[in-house]
Amino acid sequence: MPLVNPRKNLISICITDRKSDGTIYEKHIDVIRTMEKNNWKIKTHKIWVKGLGINMFRLNYMHIMTFMKKLSKVNLTKEFKPDIFVDDKSTKYENYGYGMSLDVCELLIKEHTAIGDIVYDPFMGSGTTAIASIKNCRNYFGSEIDEKVKKLAENRLSSY
């Protein structure tokens, strides 16, 4: 789930490392290097623990990294923000294997955007970022190239 706020020059990226042939490929390191090479500075790096299920082919955590063009000391809220989220509420929707936690998505939106801001998700998937945006009075738009998944997102969004 990338979360883009163009007015604040802010991008949040949620990415998992991958297991391959019994080893872990740490994709988040490549993301950090690429962003820094393009003059983006990392503001926060958090971990989302997706529950305690064990699967030898998938990892049960994701990296949530927020990058800014210019680092800012101003927080939109004064709440303490934990660096580790433990939330196993991710959901599978109609054979769509990846379900982002709505709770984690809402936390990120509240932390990095203000009411009325625009949230863009270039990999919209099942529409969780859009739903979290609507629930928190943000404007949103998203992109999804898979027509089946796009229809799933449209169906979910129709009840909001």
Question: At which residue positions do the language-model features occur?
Answer:
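Core catalytic lobe of class I
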Residues: 1-143, 148-151
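Short, conserved SAM-binding/catalytic segment
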Residues: 154-160
